[in-house]
Design a protein with these regions (language model features):
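Anion-recognition interface
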Residues: 1-365
């Protein structure tokens, strides 16, 4: 039976890629120290989709939530389950998840980031998940209260209440994301301190980032999503085609040429919402790793919106993207040809070797 289970449930875009990369790279060291990461990163993601019963989940899931929970319960030490998609679970689904891990001591871990950085990264994540709405439309919907999913699934206060109310206050943990310029290991040490991971146990490589797209690259992807129509409606096919061949191989490699963000016309609104969030979290009984002041936006400067790009800028980026995809296709074709030649050479060597052996045996007769 597991002693403690740490459920790191979100929020998205709070450094989870870096934290999870450290965890999975050091899973053997963690296991030797009595800390289990059940399944794999993909298995935990599949289990999340099963728990939430999302429409884009794979139909033939091997790793259901019940299977992951059983794996966790069967470990005699501590267990870590980390997937930022868990934060989007409903209250009923969250309760099911916690109950499935009993009688272990379940801890809930939620990370929070300032809203000035959260808003553009959330829109971009939606674009990279096949959405097609404009940045301005997204911001307007959030501001008018017409997109409650943002507050439920991408901010710490509501997520922490939905999950944290299921466990005692001493088992609710809020990690604040350090501001830009902080040492890259600060976030990791905050997580490690909560989960009881000894200092120095895990090797920290250069932080694995989930780089943002520039304004033009994001706009190209948004228009591609619209043009796809009903093709690749499920997440896995979309990831294997669009995410792999367009986003990861080309768009993310271009660098963030033109950064974008919330305009200064909404700065006062963002600051007000941040103060409300800080007040609510200060009043909620939980353990804070970091400082709630880090949720207060700083360095709010004017930036352009992808909506402001003219068609010429988007066309130039699209053409450059097509050229890069052709180069990528050529590289893949070259590797495939080389692989074919290597396999063919091995087959010929085996055939020639077999023929020579048979000839030698025939000669001895």
């Amino acid at each position: 039976m597991a002693r403690r289970v740490f459920l790191h449930v979100g929020a998205p875009k709070t450094g989870s890629t870096f934290v999870q990369d450290v965890l999975w790279r050091n899973r053997r060291e963690l296991k030797r120290a009595g800390i289990l990461l059940p399944g794999s990163a993909r298995a935990q993601d599949a289990a999340m989709t099963d728990l939430r019963q999302v429409p884009w989940r794979d139909a033939d899931l091997r790793w259901t939530w019940d299977r992951l929970a059983a794996k966790a319960r069967g470990w005699p030490g501590d267990v870590i389950i980390s997937n930022e998609g868990l934060g989007g679970a409903s209250s009923v689904q969250a309760a099911r998840a916690v109950e499935s891990l009993l009688p272990a001591e379940v801890h809930i871990v939620v990370a929070g980031r300032d809203l000035w950085r959260t808003l553009p990264s959330t829109w971009q994540q939606s674009i990279r998940a096949r959405s097609g709405w404009r940045f301005g439309a997204f911001l307007g919907a959030v501001e008018r209260g017409e997109f409650d999913t943002f507050w439920e699934n991408y901010t710490a206060n509501r997520m922490l209440r939905r999950w944290g109310d299921l466990v005692p206050a001493e088992r609710r943990h809020l990690v604040t994301v350090p501001p830009p310029g902080a040492p890259h290991d600060t976030l990791w040490h905050r997580f490690a301190g909560i989960m009881g991971i000894p200092d120095g146990l895990c090797e920290l490589a250069a932080p694995t980032s989930n780089p943002s797209l520039g304004a033009a690259e994001a706009e190209v992807l948004r228009r591609v999503n619209l043009a796809l129509g009903d093709r690749y409606p499920l997440r896995r096919p979309y990831q294997e085609v669009v995410q792999r061949h367009l986003v990861d191989s080309v768009l993310r490699q271009r660098g963030n040429g033109l950064r974008f963000g919330v305009g200064l016309d909404r700065a006062a609104w963002v600051a007000d919402q941040a103060e409300r969030q800080i007040t609510e979290l200060r009043d909620y009984p939980c353990q804070v790793a970091g400082d709630l002041a880090e949720l207060r936006p700083t360095g709010m400067t004017q930036s352009r919106s992808p909506d402001e790009l003219d068609d010429g800028q988007v066309l130039t980026t699209a053409i450059e993207t097509i050229v890069a995809m052709l180069e990528q296709a050529e590289a893949l074709s070259t590797r495939a040809d080389r692989r074919y030649e290597e396999i063919l050479a091995r087959v010929r060597a085996r055939v020639d070797g077999g023929v020579r052996r048979r000839l030698r045996r025939a000669g001895r007769r």
